[in-house]
Amino acid sequence: MAVGKNKRLTKGGKKGAKKKIVDPFSKKDWYDVKAPAMFNIRNLGKTLVTRTQGTRIASDGLKGRVYEVSLADLQNDEVAFRKFKLITEDVQGKNCLTNFHGMDLTRDKMCSMVKKWQTMIEAHVDVKTTDGYLLRLFCVGFTKRRNNQIRKTSYAQHQQVRQIRKKMMEIMTREVQTNDLKEVVNKLIPDSIGKDIEKACQSIYPLHDVYVRKVKMLKKPKFELGKLMELHGEGGAGTAAKATGDDTGAKVERADGYEPPIQESV
């Protein structure tokens, strides 16, 4: 029998003794997520990110994060079937400033609307806003029974479906093309576009449950900090005064470490 130490056992023992358990959360920081000024509740919650270490900067890890929030939480409302996507575009101090990134209906709402004995009409269109955002809007609507109808089914003819789809596309294009992103979001919150489509299509075939069911962000213009600050109600006292219709101006929340954008001309 060879006399000597068992190298494998001693080596393994040393390795195990050296290893230290480090809590990963000790290297992370919490940041507040702020919604744009279009919504009633600005503070969405908190997000976690690893602290700045060497070339890895914390704010770079936060930019581009997408948060899906129910409209009920944003507006302090009970109607909770709309979900808004918000994307972090800039970090000011401990605040993540977000912008609109998309909208969707919840699955249970979509499933509750689809029923037998009616026609489902869908349309989609790609439209550019006045400030250069390219959006794809999807619309859905359902035929309904007339007041004096005896027949069980309420199916629309193919020609009527085509007319309604054309009307949907026209109204969506008109409403988005003539407005900037902020005004479009203000129309999506109460879904005034869906109500306009419902009214316009009454003469072709009566509809109900007409909604802009989805909005996708296809292209964005070049990022400008000044425009993002305006969305968050921080574009200066002049713009705030115009919005409120008051000469004194409105009090706005400033993010920690906020610096006003440099103006090209005075």
From Swiss-Prot:
Region feature (Disordered): 236-266
Subcellular location: Cytoplasm; Nucleus; Nucleus, Nucleolus
Domain of life: Eukaryota
Compositional bias annotation for Basic and acidic residues: 244-257
UniProt keyword Ribonucleoprotein present: yes
Keyword annotations from UniProtKB, A to Z: Cytoplasm, Nucleus, Ribonucleoprotein, Ribosomal protein
InterPro entries: Ribosomal_eS1, Ribosomal_eS1_CS, Ribosomal_eS1_euk
GO cellular component terms, A-Z: cytosolic small ribosomal subunit; nucleolus; small-subunit processome
Family: Belongs to the eukaryotic ribosomal protein eS1 family.
Subunit structure: Component of the small ribosomal subunit. Mature ribosomes consist of a small (40S) and a large (60S) subunit. The 40S subunit contains about 33 different proteins and 1 molecule of RNA (18S). The 60S subunit contains about 49 different proteins and 3 molecules of RNA (28S, 5.8S and 5S). Part of the small subunit (SSU) processome, composed of more than 70 proteins and the RNA chaperone small nucleolar RNA (snoRNA) U3.
UniProt function note: Component of the small ribosomal subunit. The ribosome is a large ribonucleoprotein complex responsible for the synthesis of proteins in the cell. Part of the small subunit (SSU) processome, first precursor of the small eukaryotic ribosomal subunit. During the assembly of the SSU processome in the nucleolus, many ribosome biogenesis factors, an RNA chaperone and ribosomal proteins associate with the nascent pre-rRNA and work in concert to generate RNA folding, modifications, rearrangements and cleavage as well as targeted degradation of pre-ribosomal RNA by the RNA exosome.
Protein name, UniProt field: Small ribosomal subunit protein eS1
Source organism of the structure: Tetraodon nigroviridis (Spotted green pufferfish)
